[in-house]
């Protein structure tokens, strides 16, 4: 869990669940960073929320071999809450995506992040920060939920709104 703190005059904003136990895990072998894998490799990771969240934004991040992204939450009752689905990933789409309104995700929900890659025999993948390397990285920006958060309009223009640019589940 990698937390970054940002503040404004009214509230402190918690951020950045990057689906890794620590920053060091991003540089070592692990279930989602072993990129020299057979054809059809994909990254998948999940986490269970210890508290209710209000989702503010998400940053799915892959490089040139990324082919798709899907992130959703499954509530303890089994309800599927779509967060983002990008069936045809494009390198130029790296960036933050914001819901039109804060999205409430209940405590105990499991967030799943899944990305696929074109790692055919002609596309040998290694993890790294260069464009020609590859990544599976998906920070989620949130604040602890308060009643009524889901009614708060984030005021994001439609050029970066999840609901306007990305196909939901």
What are these model-derived regions, one by one?
Residues 149-169:
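Residue-level detector of functionally pivotal "anchor" positions at catalytic/ligand-binding pockets or at interdomain
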